[in-house]
Amino acid sequence: MNWLFFIVFLGLALFLIWNGKDRFSKKEWVRMALMLGLILLGTFIIGFFFKWLSLSLSMFSIAAARHYTAIISISFLCLWGLKLAVVLLCTIFAWIIGFHEVHNAENYQKISSISNKFGPGLLIAAKCLVSFGAFLMFYGIWLTAAV
């Protein structure tokens, strides 16, 4: 079961990292903040559901219910954080280039040509690093935890 959840969450993470939505509008930033609230609310709902399963149906112990509640909520928080990391990297880079366009106009053409030349490769490298981090996080969450 742990392998299944590892593969599912890693697949979701890779989809979120590589889906191409690297820049957010204000509406999408608000949605991202609401997703954090929903993840935290979902943690309580999942916790009560697993506790109910353990007490009424005796499917597993309360300790196992707490364990799975924790690792599922941590997995969703990791998904949220990974997408946030990719979007923040792209946003910070865009802000730096925008700053140079306004406040460093005499050198903006040089910087712009360099960023156009190396920017896509750096974005791919950053996404590869975040993907590797996702693999390490979900491996640690799902495959090294013992109940």
Predicted features and spans:
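N-terminal signal-anchor/start-transfer transmembrane helix
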Residues: 2-26
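Alpha-helical transmembrane spans of integral membrane proteins, capturing the lipid-embedded, hydrophobic core
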Residues: 6-7, 36-44, 76-80, 84, ...
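A generic, lipid-embedded transmembrane alpha helix
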Residues: 31-57
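Loop-to-transmembrane boundary segments
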Residues: 69-72, 111-135
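Juxtamembrane inter-helical linkers in multi-pass membrane proteins
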Residues: 96-115
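Juxtamembrane boundary at the C-terminal end of a transmembrane helix
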Residues: 133-147
